[in-house]
Amino acid sequence: MKLHDLKPALGAHRKRKRIGRGIGSGKGKTGGKGMMGQKARSGPNPSPSFEGGQMRITRKMPKLRGFKNRWRIEYQIINTGQLNNVPDGTELTINAMIEQGWVQPAKPVKILGDGELERKLTIHAHKFSASARARIEAAGGAAIETPWIVERRSRSRGPNPPRHHRKAEATPGA
């Protein structure tokens, strides 16, 4: 027996039913689209919020308007008052905050100025509020911003390289 002699078993492949080819075919006349209303016609359907000309509920109620910004960056917040249990003179990096269980590695970290800071700390974070920076520097410490690099995944080629690598790859002979 050779590969070209192989055939599927009888009844394994059912023939495709052609739609709209007469009422005797089993899928004729309306072709599986039900009664012939607007949604049975060719072309796009009305939007999900369309109510046949009646004022739609999304326009009646202001709270249902607007949109969700897909590029919004949601920060994890740490207040300066929470940093008083760290020993004096410590360099507090983002990795140290992750090890302490204060933040998760998936989102950027922002330090806010709620609460007094009594320790001299060098703090690394992605963002600082103006009041937090002032409190850290008033206590004799330093606020160092580290960039937040987002790795957006593309479906075809895996994760995209970070921005600072892209220019080096693009320039020939570099």
Curated annotation (Swiss-Prot):
One of its GO terms (biological process) is translation. Residues 1-56, 150-174 are annotated as: Disordered. GO terms for molecular function: rRNA binding; structural constituent of ribosome. Keywords: Ribonucleoprotein, Ribosomal protein, RNA-binding, rRNA-binding. InterPro entries: Ribosomal_uL15, Ribosomal_uL15/eL18, Ribosomal_uL15/eL18_sf, Ribosomal_uL15_bac-type, Ribosomal_uL15_CS. Pfam families: Ribosomal_L27A. Residues 21-35 have a biased composition (Gly residues). GO terms for cellular component: cytosolic large ribosomal subunit. Binds to the 23S rRNA. Part of the 50S ribosomal subunit. HAMAP family: Ribosomal_uL15. Belongs to the universal ribosomal protein uL15 family. This is Large ribosomal subunit protein uL15. It comes from Roseiflexus castenholzii (strain DSM 13941 / HLO8).
